[in-house]
């Protein structure tokens, strides 16, 4: 029989009763076991994520089946390479106790434990987003969270923002479509969303977008189906994912990329780094490159899912960033959020720790349990050959820029072409669902805001605006 101990291995003789002065007397301060239990309970929770708070996770692997050596030198993308990973799904707006089956964007964040360090691809289940400049991000998230006075979600705030920021129309159309409430995490696609870069052995740059197509098929819920499910099970997505993996019904996704040569970037006809737009598949076709599978559940949700920490700043040789303003901001904001939420040394936790060799001069900090390896010197530059040194062969190619530093308003104000193309792809039933979902989300919204929004939908398609108006009258 295992002996019960406290956090420091001290054997506990009585775990049922507090130490008191007499049977009916007050408690004694020397009851260190009671104090330890209470103090630990007070600190069991860390700050929840300000976005993507409610989530589920699983381990798996990615296998590359295509030859991408012409585009990238990243070892993870060598043909036949198998790389372990951890994937965290999430909703965006809701708190940690929110229901899984709400109408919301889903997070799709992957940590690849590559031979060259961790690569984090922090995406969503949509290829676009509501905004293209991170300067608006805090304000946008405020519209999705609770009103500070009423502590209620506000349709008025959401539609006020969307109608004043028409670049959001593409993502709003996706969110309000039949795909706005996936039936489960297994039955939705994933996207890197941002534009990233590939760099090959010749130090040539290519622009790339990542896609993950579910092999379980797309399944969605209507508003009514979601409401009925939430009434029965607020953890429906978590339950579905966990049970599927436990039953060895491992979910899979086909991995695809869109690749565009640096010299061809102007041929798109719009800013290729605009997160509110997609790259048309007719111009930049999808390329199948492999398969991703999830095959292992976490053993401890808090340790492995709640403390999982992702950041787009984690990249490996052969993969780089782009001038996408949203991506640029996330490079800072994500690791900053993790340091606040988990601590300075969050990277040392098992779920976040690289499986490759780590050689750094970063030392100490709260909760640092790593052994220091640089015996020759603890600073850099230094004179000792056996200490870690920089390697200039990993420098990225130059990125040609032009213009002066100022706060630039986007030059591309075509907010309607891509939402129109998406709307025209929908069948009659999908359009009807779209109209009713938008009308339902406009409940309680000021008339002037609805009027402003309808003018934008009219510019996408007269049928779009007409359908919403009709649904609003019911």
Curated annotation (Swiss-Prot):
- Gene Ontology CC entries for this record: cytoplasm
List UniProt keywords, sorted A-Z. Heme, Hydrogen peroxide, Iron, Metal-binding, Oxidoreductase, Peroxidase
Gene3D superfamilies linked to this entry: Catalase core domain
Recorded E.C. number(s)? 1.11.1.6
**Matching SMART domains, A to Z?**
Catalase
Q: Tell me its cofactors.
A: heme
Alphabetized Pfam families for the sequence: Catalase (PF00199), Catalase-rel (PF06628)
Q: Where is the active site?
A: 52, 124
Q: Which reactions appear under catalytic activity for this entry?
A: 2 H2O2 = O2 + 2 H2O
Q: Which GO terms describe its molecular function?
A: catalase activity; heme binding; metal ion binding
Q: Where does heme bind?
A: 334
Q: Which GO terms describe its biological process?
A: hydrogen peroxide catabolic process; response to hydrogen peroxide
Its biological function? Decomposes hydrogen peroxide into water and oxygen; serves to protect cells from the toxic effects of hydrogen peroxide.
Provide the family line. Answer: Belongs to the catalase family.
Q: What is this protein called?
A: Catalase
Give the species: Campylobacter jejuni subsp. jejuni serotype O:2 (strain ATCC 700819 / NCTC 11168)
Which gene is this protein's source? Answer: katA
